[in-house]
From Swiss-Prot:
Localisation: Nucleus
Chain positions covered by the region annotation Disordered: 1-79, 129-244, 398-428, 485-508, 552-641
Tissue expression pattern: Expressed in the embryo. After gastrulation, expressed in almost all cells. During larval and adult stages, expressed in the dorsal and ventral nerve cord, head and tail neurons, pharynx, gut and head.
Acidic residues composition-biased segments: 571-604
One GO MF term: RNA polymerase II cis-regulatory region sequence-specific DNA binding
Segments of skewed composition (Basic and acidic residues): 131-140, 613-626
DNA-binding region: 308-394, 427-486
Name of the coding gene: ceh-38
Function description: Probable DNA-binding regulatory protein involved in cell-fate specification.
GO BP: any one term: regulation of transcription by RNA polymerase II
Organism name: Caenorhabditis elegans
Keyword match Transcription regulation: yes
Protein name: Homeobox protein ceh-38
Compositionally biased residues, Polar residues: 1-14, 28-38, 167-183, 190-204
Keywords on record: DNA-binding, Homeobox, Nucleus, Transcription, Transcription regulation
């Protein structure tokens, strides 16, 4: 350095003033960059360093003239790269600095940002240039970057011992040419979509650029970025026209002691492109997210459930009596069939309704015994336990016992009726009823073969004028009925019959409504009425006999005999009326059932008693013959003769 300055004093005054403002680039990576010029281990640049940059022939001793020629004679350059070599005026404010900046850099070195590295990573230590960002009073500050005089880097020279100026840039840095073009433009035209690198973000003037972005997008600033702008007031400086000036805060002068957080760059970037965040407390909770009460699970595999008590094969249960008892319990305690089917049987309401109407025999059930077993175990429990299993309280049952609510099936029917009334008549498929000929023909064929072929079913359908599906359904239903055997079931000798507790005796009104009980109960009531009438008539005849014996009324030579005669006549008349009524009813039924051809066939088969037509004709003729017994007919006949 001293020899180069001594050689420079031999030139003219113009060159002296220019030399004072211009120093030559010499990089010593092992230096601590403290104002100490007495270091003897400073390493100079190679002799061919400028040859690799500029095509001009430059000698190490004539480095000053090369800088002058590069400045004054750009037209003589044969390479277009010289157009990018702009002079870099250096400030004379630092005469004691050992290392200053120079303008003899290519476009790639010219675009390196003047940025002090505050992070502790090795990216900043490996960069070839560190540009000072402190304020300069030179009028060429905006156009001439200068090399920074580093302060207090401590032992960083140990990491940079063998590095030469031709060391490639770190992978984290972006293209220097694109960064240069970005910084030369107006800061207001910067695009937000570009992702800045750590080096391009904190350049020669990083803070005003971030400040402009914050001002430009202050409507979309997130709370985190607002905190960043408040906490770092040292970076916010006013603008003086196009020239941006700022000073270091006192706490920033020591670059080693004052470090920036690693996430500062991400915060600055997110402040530009971030959108307002939505607080989770403001988001309404969906209805499905609310915690519902745990629903009770009804399972047929739970061993703790009393309804799953095992019933051995040596036990016989009369399913018909059991279904009658279940129907009585449902009616008496106003228990909907849907609830009972779901919570007791774990089945649907339609399955329960079908079982109550047509209970299957116990000995012909295999897997279906489980349903009747749960029914039996439920009936065997006390009333409070039965209602507790159904999740129903006794008070609710007593309050609802006045009028039972309609079951879901009834509600469905009511809804269908209401919709049909509003929407018009609903096309419902009428139920098919076989005629007698069709029924007897199908039954006769079924006795011969229970599984006719498809062709035979088609022939039967064409002959009887039926659909093929109807014929197929008939044979399928007939096979099912034959397997059931008419639901005739009796316990085997080794089975023990489990008695079903019958309903209370006093509840006859409810028993009359339980389907199959209606007909036998009606017959019983009618039989009692006839019995009372017979007793009344017998008592009345005894009183008459007593009165006659005491002398009341006309005496009859044989009162008992006359009474027997009278009673006998009356009984005979009653028998005749009964026979006549029976014959008339039979005749009417025959007329309703079929045509004359069918009647002839039935008479030939002997299925029906002889028709009373002849007797009626004979009676009518007899009546006609007995009509002129008054003598008028004979008198008129004699007069005519």
């Amino acid at each position: 350095m001293e020899s180069s300055r001594t050689a420079a004093t031999s030139t003219n005054g113009t060159e002296k003033s220019r030399r004072r403002n211009t120093d030559y680039l010499q990089i010593d990576p092992s230096s601590t960059f403290i104002n100490n010029t007495g270091r003897g281990f400073a390493e100079e640049l190679p002799e061919n360093f400028l040859d690799t940059i500029s095509p001009h022939p430059i000698t190490p001793s004539a480095s000053t003239s090369s800088a002058t020629s590069a400045t004054e004679e750009p037209a003589t350059s044969s390479a277009p790269q010289l157009a990018s070599l702009a002079p870099m005026s250096m400030s004379s404010e630092q005469p004691s600095s050992s290392f200053s900046s120079a303008s003899l850099l290519s476009s790639s070195y010219e675009t390196i940002k003047n940025e002090p590295e505050f992070s502790g990573s090795t990216a900043g230590l490996l960069s070839p240039l560190h540009v000072d960002s402190r304020r300069r009073e030179s009028h060429d500050f905006n156009t001439s970057p200068y090399i920074k005089e580093e302060e207090d880097l401590d032992g960083s020279h140990l990491l940079m011992g063998g590095i030469r100026p031709d060391t490639p840039t770190n992978d984290r840095s972006t293209d220097l040419g694109s960064i240069s073009s970005l910084l030369n433009e107006d800061h207001h035209t910067n695009t937000i979509g570009q992702s800045p690198s750590p080096r391009s973000t904190f350049g020669s003037d990083p803070t005003p650029m971030i400040q402009r972005q914050l001002i430009k997008n202050e409507d979309g600033v997130s709370p985190g970025s607002m905190g960043f702008s408040k906490n770092h007031q040292g970076y916010q400086k006013p603008r003086n026209g196009d020239r941006m000036e700022y000073e270091k805060a006192p706490y920033q002068r020591n670059s080693r002691k004052q470090k920036k957080p690693l996430g500062l760059l991400n915060q600055a970037l997110s402040s530009v492109i971030s959108t307002p965040t939505i607080s989770s407390s403001n988001i309404p909770t969906p209805p499905s997210a609310h915690i519902a009460q745990p629903r009770r699970i009804y399972s047929t595999q739970d061993s703790n459930d009393p309804l799953n008590a095992e019933i051995g094969d040596d036990i016989y249960i009369d399913t018909k009596d059991l279904c009658k008892r279940i129907a009585f319990e449902l009616k008496n305690h106003s228990i909907p069939q849907a609830i009972f089917a779901e919570r007791i049987l774990c089945r649907s309401q339609g399955t329960l309704s079908d079982l109550l109407r047509n209970p299957k025999p116990w000995n012909k059930l295999k897997s279906g015994r489980e349903t009747f077993r749960r029914m039996y175990n439920w009936v065997a429990q006390p009333l409070a336990t039965r209602l507790a299993i159904l999740d129903m309280k006794t008070e609710d049952v007593n309050r609802a016992s006045g009028m039972s609510p309609p079951t879901p099936a009834q509600n469905v029917r009511t809804h269908r009726r209401s919709t049909s009334d509003h929407d018009g008549p609903v096309s419902k498929r009428p139920r098919l009823v076989f005629t007698d000929i069709q029924k007897r023909t199908l039954q006769a064929i079924f006795k011969e073969t229970q599984r006719p072929s498809r062709e035979m079913q088609q022939t039967i359908a064409e002959h009887l004028r039926l659909d093929l599906s109807t014929v197929a359904n008939f044979f399928m239903n007939a096979r099912r009925r034959s397997r059931l055997g008419g639901n005739i079931d009796e316990p085997t000798p080794f089975q023990q019959v489990k008695n079903i507790s019958p309903p209370p005796v006093g509840d006859t009104s409810d028993a009359l409504l339980n389907g199959d009980d209606h007909v036998p109960l009606l017959n019983t009531v009618m039989a009692e009425m006839y019995k009372e009438g017979a007793i009344a008539t017998s008592n009345h005849s005894a009183e008459q006999r007593e009165m006659i014996e005491r002398g009341f009324g006309v005496s009859i030579p044989g009162p008992s005999h006359s009474g027997e005669l009278l009673n006998g006549d009356s009984h005979e008349d009653d028998e005749e009326l009964d026979e006549l009524n029976d014959s008339e009813l039979a005749y009417e039924e025959d007329v309703e059932i079929g045509d004359e051809e069918e009647e002839d066939e039935e008479q030939a088969n002997g299925d029906i008693l002889p028709t009373p037509k002849v007797e009626e004709l004979e009676e009518k003729t007899v009546i006609k013959e007995e009509a002129p017994d008054d003598g008028e007919y004979g008198a008129t006949k004699l007069a005519a003769n």
